[in-house]
Amino acid sequence: IPSRNMDNETKFMITCMLFTAICSSASSAEWKATVVKSIDALVTSCVVVPCSFSHTGGNLPTSRLRGIWHEKDDKKSNIYHEDYTLIENNFKDRTQLVGRLGQNNCTLEITGVKDHDNGPFCFRVELVRTENNDPTKDMFSFVDNCVELKMLPEPAEPTVIKPMTATQGEPYTVTCSVIHTCPTHVPKLTWNLDSTKVIVHHKDIKQGNWETQSSLTVIPEEKDDNREITCTAEFNGGLKSSETFTLHVKHIENYNHIIIPAVVGIGTALLFGIPCILMAKKYK
């Protein structure tokens, strides 16, 4: 009997330990945030920091959640807060959440980027009571998942992809693209050529990076040979960059100056030659 009791006690203790381990693991796993570690930020422009999270409160509407972004070294130094008075003066009117907290989206936008906005910045979530909007004890700062901004004083030049040579009278397509980190205010790509066929695409290339692409199609003429074509990218905030290349047009030989006189000559010969032959046969 004692051994049976010992077996039961051992089984019970093992069960409790397993249950505690599982609960602890599940609890810690519920407070999670996914934030890019580093992202480029063009000075004077804007940057959008992708962020998603999970919490212990289950499915809650945005009104029951409070999202805060703060400096890593000082949780009270808020760069974004729904209470405007709690935002650091340097960041007032420059930050907003572009994601919906109720959809576990904590994506942050910073506009008018300054060269000292480098961070690191961390996200904090608080569960609140709807009746008075006071935070509950359920809150978490994701200080192990923060973002640092890599400051860019100048924008990168656009990338141009093109065929080496254009053919006179045939469609010629060239593509200009630029990488950026502000999908809420995308760069504007323009050409120094007029064309009714310009197609623009925007593509998410992950980790907070986006690509804006402009494809230009023209039908070059002989006069366009050695013409310089420029693609200009204008970023939010006014900074610009450009890329220029020289268009080489392959000429199509025109043989009309040979064909037309030959046809005229043959026609004239036939016009006057045939009656002469007929008359010669008649009087022969």
Positions of PLM-derived features:
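Extracellular beta-strand/loop-rich beta-sandwich domains predominantly from IgSF
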Residues: K37-D40, D93-H116, R129, K162-T165, ...
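N-terminal Sec-dependent signal peptide, specifically the hydrophobic helical h-region
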Residues: I1-S45, N118-F121, E131, V147, ...
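Flexible inter-domain hinge/linker segments at boundaries of tandem extracellular adhesion modules
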Residues: L18-A33, H70-K75, D138-V160, N192-V198, ...
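Short edge beta-strand/loop segments characteristic of extracellular beta-sandwich folds
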Residues: P50-S54, T173-I179
